[in-house]
Regions:
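Peripheral terminal and linker regions in Fe-S/redox and tRNA-modifying enzymes
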Residues: 1-188
Length: 188
């Protein structure tokens, strides 16, 4: 799947799969000595995600560097554990502890039901994405510097306030996605 969230270079990244599950990457990061995350799990059900988050927390508590602030990053744990394979093994051990603990960390997310229909207006542009729902669009917005003025956010809020089922979602790279827009709404 397309790595839209850059899951492979995060402390803990989840890459969505077409079947509705996630691949989990751990101990990646940018900055000095950048590293891709290690694939630690495949096809994880959405309701089981918190087990993987807790395993990451326990792994960092066990192998993270608390002495040197410059190395207090998850990507350095790959070195500490002897490389990506050693890190994957250490992570799996912590995951096994979490799963064996009996703690119920299952979540039950409900998939939203969208009844909104397109209006027949077709739009295209570098920031316009077609949604899987026919006739609906997403507009991506990446504010320069990542910090829009309050007035800009208020204007955006005013613009979408009267639009049915329109939401704004934020991505880790500071991009905002305004979703569930009809063609006419996307043009605004």
């Amino acid at each position: 799947p397309k790595n839209m969230t850059h899951a492979t270079f995060r402390d803990l990244g989840f890459a969505a799969r077409p079947d509705g599950t996630f691949d989990v990457y751990s101990a990646g990061g940018l900055g000095n000595n950048p590293r891709f995350g290690v694939l630690v799990a495949q096809a994880v059900a959405p309701e089981k995600i918190l087990y993987y988050i807790k395993a990451m927390w326990l792994t960092f508590r066990a192998y993270g560097n608390y002495e040197n602030r410059g190395k207090a990053r998850t990507r350095y744990m790959q070195e500490v554990c002897g490389g990506p394979e050693g890190y994957a093994k250490a992570y799996q051990e912590k995951l096994a502890e979490v799963l064996a603990s009996g703690e119920d960390l299952d979540i039950h997310p409900e998939a939203p039901v969208y009844e909104k229909q397109g209006d027949g207006v077709v739009v295209a542009g570098p920031r316009v994405l077609e949604q899987k729902q026919p006739g609906l669009y997403t507009v991506s917005w990446h504010p320069l510097g990542g910090q829009p003025a309050v007035e800009t956010l208020c204007a955006l809020s005013d613009a979408i306030a009267g639009m049915e089922a329109v939401e704004m979602r934020l991505a880790p790279d500071e991009t905002a996605y305004i979703i569930n827009l009809t063609g006419a709404e996307a043009q605004k």
